[in-house]
């Protein structure tokens, strides 16, 4: 008998063991839209074990090309490999982009570093095809050439920097020498432009001292008279009297300090 509410088919002998709690069958016949000739339905237990892998793992085969000794983490990394780009399609005959079911490569695809020191060993073939490297000797020659070129570039940069420093020092010395020469020239011109000092004669000093002895401050008329008499300018007479007053003030202070002994005076 087939019950619509059940997901599996109950056979006749099993149905005889069910208790009679169901209502008695009526005389009316029920029609179903589906065919009554249904295929044998598998038990739910078998389906659940098959779908969720609850049975022994040896019963079911692997559905991918991963080797049984690969760990789950490595398989996950392999599943997230990016698809080939336009440049990668050029190497479609290589083993990296071949069909998955063709071969089972080793699981340590990204564990070791390749020749270039950055990419894994799986990319060595691309490195070789790009630079034309056939074996390790050629690769060593290429690395030696690159190192030599780097050293030559650094040496040339050092030489150029040294030359620039030398040129800068030469320019600084030239500028300093030029500034010192200009300063010397300016000093020489200033000394040349300065009027030569001409001291007063004994006669002029005696007459000026006599006038200062009588009058410390001299008026303009007397100053003009002395200038005409001593053959001096009005400004020279005026400056001489100013200096003589300052000198007299200093001498009077020294005399007062000598006689009184007070250093504050």
Swiss-Prot record:
Protein keywords: Developmental protein, DNA-binding, Homeobox, Nucleus, Transcription, Transcription regulation
Basic and acidic residues: bias regions: 163-173
Family assignment from sequence similarity: Belongs to the Abd-B homeobox family.
Function per UniProt: Sequence-specific transcription factor which is part of a developmental regulatory system that provides cells with specific positional identities on the anterior-posterior axis.
Cellular component, GO, one term: nucleoplasm
DNA-binding region(s) in UniProt: 193-252
Major site of localization recorded for this protein: nucleus
Taxonomy of the source species: Eukaryota, Metazoa, Chordata, Craniata, Vertebrata
Region Disordered, residue ranges: 158-181
InterPro entries: DUF3528 (IPR021918), HD (IPR001356), HD_metazoa (IPR020479), Homeobox_CS (IPR017970), Homeodomain-like_sf (IPR009057)
Subcellular location: Nucleus
Name of this protein: Homeobox protein Hox-D11
Pfam families tied to this protein: DUF3528, Homeodomain
Superkingdom of source: Eukaryota
SMART domains (alphabetical): HOX
Molecular function via GO: DNA-binding transcription factor activity, RNA polymerase II-specific; RNA polymerase II cis-regulatory region sequence-specific DNA binding
């Amino acid at each position: 008998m087939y019950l619509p509410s059940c997901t599996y088919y109950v056979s006749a002998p099993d149905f005889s063991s069910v208790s009679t709690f169901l209502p008695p069958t009526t005389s009316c016949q029920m029609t179903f839209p589906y065919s009554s000739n249904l295929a044998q339905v598998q038990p739910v237990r078998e389906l659940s074990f098959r779908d969720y892998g609850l049975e022994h793992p040896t019963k079911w085969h692997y559905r991918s090309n991963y080797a049984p000794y690969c760990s789950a983490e490595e398989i996950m990394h392999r599943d997230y490999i990016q698809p080939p780009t336009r440049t990668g399609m050029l190497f479609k005959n290589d083993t990296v982009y071949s069909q998955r079911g063709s071969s089972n490569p080793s699981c340590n695809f990204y564990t070791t570093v390749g020749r270039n020191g950055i990419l894994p060993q799986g990319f060595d073939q691309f490195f070789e095809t790009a630079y034309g490297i056939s074996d390790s000797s050629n690769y060593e020659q290429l690395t030696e050439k690159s190192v030599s070129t780097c050293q030559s570039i650094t040496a040339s940069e050092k030489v150029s920097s040294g030359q620039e420093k030398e040129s800068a020092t030469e320019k600084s010395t030239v500028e300093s020498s030029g500034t010192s020469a200009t300063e010397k020239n300016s000093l020489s011109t200033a000394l040349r432009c300065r009027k030569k000092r001409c001291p007063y004669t004994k006669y002029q000093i005696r007459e000026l001292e006599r006038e200062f002895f009588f009058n410390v401050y001299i008026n303009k008329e007397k100053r003009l008279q002395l200038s005409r008499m001593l053959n001096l300018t009005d400004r020279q007479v005026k400056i001489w009297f100013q200096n003589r007053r300052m000198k007299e003030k200093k001498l009077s202070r020294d005399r007062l300090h000598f006689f009184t002994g007070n250093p504050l005076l």
